[in-house]
Curated annotation (Swiss-Prot):
It is found in: Cytoplasm. Its cofactor is Zn(2+). It comes from Malacoplasma penetrans (strain HF-2). Belongs to the endoribonuclease YbeY family. This is Endoribonuclease YbeY. Its EC number is 3.1.-.-. GO terms for biological process: rRNA processing. Binds 1 zinc ion. The gene is ybeY.
Length: 150
């Protein structure tokens, strides 16, 4: 069982967007065969807040699309709270335009990206990236949001 707690203070998300986030999350938790009750927080923010967080925690002074803070410790979950994801709504919009695909696909991609980081996946090395992005594309496909080439 999983629960996503969505914090959207600026009311960027529609009900349809929230449903999509829950659908993507559910598919990941099914695909990863997670059994325990797991909760994660998703904070929908603007580019200004994204830039502040990116500068504070990554020492990079520009907005980023998604930042995850995992509470996993060496593959062990000490609490039901898996972690926190901060997602820039403005980046979802601009990157959907930039990559010439739908807002929904970009939202699904970035939510899945954040969740997989919470689960301990990374993309620093080529072999890690292949695994992580492969999982993301599989979830997008299962959710009807296209494949790797879309």
């Amino acid at each position: 069982m999983f629960d996503v707690q969505i914090f959207d203070e600026k009311k960027f998300l529609s009900k349809k967007d929230i449903s999509l986030i829950k659908k993507v999350s559910k598919f990941i938790f099914i695909e990863e065969k997670l059994k325990n009750k797991i909760i994660f927080e998703l904070h929908i923010i603007d580019n200004n807040e994204s830039q502040k967080i990116n500068k504070q925690y990554r020492n990079k002074d520009y907005p980023t699309d998604v930042i995850s803070f995992s509470f996993w410790e060496e593959g062990l979950l000490k609490t039901a709270l898996l972690g926190e994801i901060y997602l820039s709504y403005e980046k979802v919009v601009s990157q959907a335009e930039e990559f010439k695909h739908s807002f929904e696909r970009e939202l699904g991609f970035l939510v899945s990206h954040g969740i997989y980081h919470l689960l301990g996946y990374d993309h620093e090395e080529e072999d890690e990236a292949k695994i992580m992005f492969g999982k993301q594309y599989q979830v997008l496909k299962l959710c009807g949001l296209g494949s790797v080439n879309d």
